[in-house]
Amino acid sequence: MSLLTAVIAFLFISTFCSGKFPIYTIPDKIGPWSPIDINHLSCPNNLEVEDEGCTTLTAFNYMELKVGYITSIKVDGFTCTGVVTEAETYTNFVGYVTTTFKRKHFRPNVSACRAAFSWKTAGDPRYEESLHNPYPDSHWLRTVTTTKESLLIISPSVVDMDAYDKTLYSKMFPNGKCFPPISDSPFCSTNHDYTLWLPEKEKLSMSCNIFVSSKGKKATKDGRLCGFVDERGLYKSLKGACKLKLCGMAGMRLMDGSWVSLQRADAPEWCPPGALVNVHDFHSDEIAHFVVEELIKKREECLDTLETILTTKSISFRRLSHFRKLVPGLGKAYTLINNTLMEAEAHYKSIREWKEIIPSKGCLKAGGRCHPHYDGIFFNGIILGPNGDVLIPEMQSSLLQQHIELLESSMIPLRHPLADSSAIFRSDNEAEDFVDVHLPDTQKQVSDIDLGFPEWKRYFLIGVSAIALFSLAIIIAVCCRKFKRRKRPKPGPIELVRKVSVTSQSGKVVPSWESYKEGATSQP
């Protein structure tokens, strides 16, 4: 099978089989056979719309995935954590103030979070001031508690958005998924009970910058939409398409895995959860342009073969493979029966595995049954080999498997959830560590003596207190001295008489009359 055939079969398919790519086209409806002259041979024009006779073309604009679009949509946002800082102060008798800081949390509201985020992004000093610890108040011999609420903003905080349903994914969300859904709520809850995640842009649709407007032509028959010719000139059938919204935009997923913002009156079913879309990257765009070039080239090769047949007046079954319809849709099939050229109307479909048309040895399934052969010749160059195997010329192409692998590599899912049950954002016990990195320290502080007075009043009070203490000390000393004097015992009357002193005739002092008397009698 040529490279063109593989690409064409991939881009134009009419039946769905998950996980496989089309590799060939074969009639699902064929016959009856009728003899023709070689002059009636014609090459199929695969660029023309021939699917079910839908030949009416109308110009229109449509949306498709932007070229270069990456698989995951990144949404910028920020987290908002409500923090209450509590300052507890106690002033003792001598004026020492002890301050102890404690930290608690509260669940913030969305409007306050957006206001704080605006302050931070604008460089408003009010945001930094709001994070400072509260200025502690104090009263003598009292415990005073001062609280201050702050909103801690951490940005950027980038999450992944699923383009299919706008679901947000991040390991910071419970179970890795935003809840409540961002379409129903302006915020997402996180693994930290007091932290909210909000998108930087309130309108999440602004994050879905993945579409581009293209021009094409609708193919209709009697007002019924069959398919369209895209901007690159390729016809795409709507057979087997299913409804799918990307970033809230309604559209259809075609059977080749592409997405287009088309809708039909006879709306198809919604796509199953596993039906993803192809990434529209530069490589796939190059393939699309390459297909158009190859279609033209293959038509030229077919015309060259037709010219050779008409010139030589001879034909072989191998040359008939050039006249096969390369894309699903209406066409013709050719064969040789009893050395007579035969033609039949046919409707081609795509297949993804060879066993779909070769279910068993010697059986070529076409039109819902094993198609009969005539002297080992089926049609379109397909023959029965000497050992009874069905031989298809395109099966021998060395480029086929390489191109199938190339097509498979371009089928990349959009869904990239970051949910990891083992990676919890923060547990309750780690909440302090979460906010302490971004807020001032809350260690215990003890101030100097502070009675709450201004500077001059404090020194005045100290001076007055010193004078008062000095005066009080003097008063206490005087009072103590007087008190001690009053406590001495008074002498009796006899002791007073005994202690009276007299002076003798000799001029000596005699302590008492009795002493004088005793001294006088003792003299000779």
UniProtKB/Swiss-Prot annotation:
Residues 504-524 are annotated as: Disordered. Its main location: virion. Primary surface antigen capable of inducing and reacting with virus-neutralizing antibodies. Almost all human and veterinary vaccines are based on the functional aspects of the G protein. GO terms for cellular component: membrane; viral envelope; virion membrane. Residues 1-19 form the signal peptide. Arg-352 is highly involved in rabies virus pathogenicity. Its mutation dramatically attenuates the virus. Homotrimer. Interacts with matrix protein. This is Glycoprotein. The gene is G.
